[in-house]
Amino acid sequence: MNVKIKKLHNWDMTPTEAILLQRELAQKVSACGTLSSISLVAGADVWHSRTSGMGRAAVVVLSYPDMNLVEVSRSEGDCHIPYIPGLLSFREMPLLLSAFEGLESMPDFILMDGQGLAHPRRLGIASHLGLFLNKPVIGCAKSRLVGEYAPLADEAGSYSDLYHNSQLVGRVLRTRRGVNPLFISVGHKICLEEACSRVADCCRGYRLPEPLRHAHLAAAQLI
């Protein structure tokens, strides 16, 4: 069973056009939904060479809830589009979609290394990906792009809501004692409470939940 990908738009556009498109697509993102009958979860990450301009996207599929590796799909190519804050998906999405096309199994939900609604125009890479795949996607970022939050306690499981322009856009979650927290936000077709619960379910003592930890290793070709 192959992952079905919608044809939302092409990639030949200026930054100004991309921003306008983000505002349009953000209206289609769903921040509602819960998951049931879960057996597979995917993690997705993209690695970039600092010298050659090449990128490598990796998607890993793990069994849920035991987190055993089921499948790895990679896609490599040139990333000539420079990184522009807020437009990350226009640099990384073509490689990501190619990697998803290579999957033989269909994940029930996806963890994406990046923002979802915690984005200036409410369309980070996790939300953009969710619209292409029409699947539940959770944004799980290692750093903040927008928003303010109250300090967290040191214990694993402590959290603080993330607000941007007085709107709740995500949650800052500490997944391991004494390490920097993760920035969780809705990507598509899932509510924030469910997203945070599933991220916590996927953690096994590391800062990153297992799907993203494996995706990071796969993108760097370490697994």
From Swiss-Prot:
Mg(2+) binds at D45, D113. The record marks Y83 as: Interaction with target DNA. Its cofactor is Mg(2+). One of its GO terms (molecular function) is deoxyribonuclease V activity. GO terms for biological process: DNA repair. It is an enzyme of class 3 (hydrolase). Keywords: Cytoplasm, DNA damage, DNA repair, Endonuclease, Hydrolase, Magnesium, Metal-binding, Nuclease. Its main location: cytoplasm. This is Endonuclease V. It comes from Dehalococcoides mccartyi (strain CBDB1).
